[in-house]
Amino acid sequence: DYVDYAKKDADGIVREDLLLTMSEKLNEVVDRLEKLGLVILKDENGKYVTRGNRNLKINGENIKPILAEAALQKENVSVLNRVNIIDYAVEGNRIKGAYGIGIENDTFYIIEAKAVIIATGGAAGLYKPNNPGFSRHKMWYPPFNTGAGYAMGIKAGAEMTTFEMRFIALR
């Protein structure tokens, strides 16, 4: 159902295998978020409140603080707030970390890691927003998502796929 919906929304330009994998894992991820404290609105009978026939109502503004708190509870995890990653540290054909600059203190960071995941949130900031005038950046996606993480990955030799695919957040 989700794969068909997303395929139709994208005029057929999708990788169905990726859509299927995402849809198969979505409920599990949402359940984990709810256990971490994300409020998913429910009616008096305990059933999820929907917005239309494909969306649940959530308090989504709390997702980042909830995930940040969960990350802080993990062993061997450091959180660097307000650090802008400027490039990946590459050795041979492996990304071994990243370089960053503290945006409040101009500190240069050398970060070493066993694994690096590019999770930059898209590149919506490349496009002109639909909203006019002073409301230009009152939109779902942050205007600062310019695709820099993708560009760093490509420069480092990472394989990239499905840039044409738009994520549709449905459950």
Where are these regions (language model features)?
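Well-ordered beta-strand positions in beta-sheet-rich domains
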Residues: 108-112
